[in-house]
Amino acid sequence: MNEKIRWLRNKIKSINLDAMIVSNPINITYLTGLKEEGILILGRKENFFITDGRYVEAVNSKLTIEDEIIVEDIRDLSQEDRENLFLFCENVGFEEHYVTYSKYKEYMYKYKINNLVETEKIIEKQRAIKDEEEIKNITKACNITDDCFEY
């Protein structure tokens, strides 16, 4: 499992959440490297990326076994499948600054979630802390920008 997903799984356990729905595309890209449209679900035991069927093949080609993310086509999920994603989950986190009220109600209805809990920007706070790879990429981008101005 990649380090960012592992970190988030540990974090949600530490704040007494059983699962989390990540729908902000920026946070999904940060956690997985995926840029395709969809939602990321960190369940009790498994991680799912639910997307439109047009993206399933592309997403599967980018993920590795180590990512431990199951890719599902939204059209292939029955109501029972959706409900089972959060089976035995008492508290499910969501991104309160990104999710609209109508989407909140949709999550409650579609996934039969008992208690959706605001996560208070836990991913955004972690994104602010840069790892070595991110610092390297920022430095490279700055150097390219400097070269443009010198030209």
Model-derived features: positions:
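Fold-independent oxyanion-binding glycine-rich loops
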Residues: 23-25, 52-53, 96-97, 121
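Flexible, acidic/His-enriched mid-domain "rim/lid" segments that flank
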Residues: 3-5, 76-151
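Terminal domain-start leader segments
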Residues: 1-50, 57, 86-89, 109-114, ...
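Short, hinge-like loop/turn segments at secondary-structure boundaries
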Residues: 37-40, 66-67, 134
